[in-house]
């Protein structure tokens, strides 16, 4: 029986985290503000400066793009 109670309590905890489903939207918005430039912006800057976005057949990561943009300044 105690194991069942344990699973029930965890299930309730999960529902509480899911409950304020509006909060993740706010969180992502806040983190986006703190990140500075978003990946989309990086791609646009790279395109305008003539920096290739693709390397070895795959897209560059945000950090790699950031480095290349910094170097090109």
From Swiss-Prot:
Induction: Expressed in the early phase of the viral replicative cycle. GO terms for cellular component: virion component. Keywords: DNA-binding, Late protein, Virion. Coiled coil: none annotated. GO terms for molecular function: DNA binding. Its main location: virion. Residues 1-35 are annotated as: Disordered. The keyword DNA-binding applies. The keyword DNA-binding applies. It is found in: Virion. May play a role in genome packaging through direct interaction with viral DNA. Binds to ssDNA and dsDNA with the same apparent affinity in vitro. Belongs to the asfivirus P10 family. This is Structural DNA-binding protein p10.
């Amino acid at each position: 029986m105690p194991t069942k109670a344990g699973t029930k309590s965890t299930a309730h905890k999960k529902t509480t985290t899911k409950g304020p489903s509006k909060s993740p939207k706010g969180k992502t918005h806040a983190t986006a503000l703190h990140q500075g430039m978003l990946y989309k912006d990086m791609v646009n800057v790279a395109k305008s400066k003539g920096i290739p976005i693709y390397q070895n057949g795959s897209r560059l990561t945000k950090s790699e793009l950031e480095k290349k943009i910094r170097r090109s300044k």
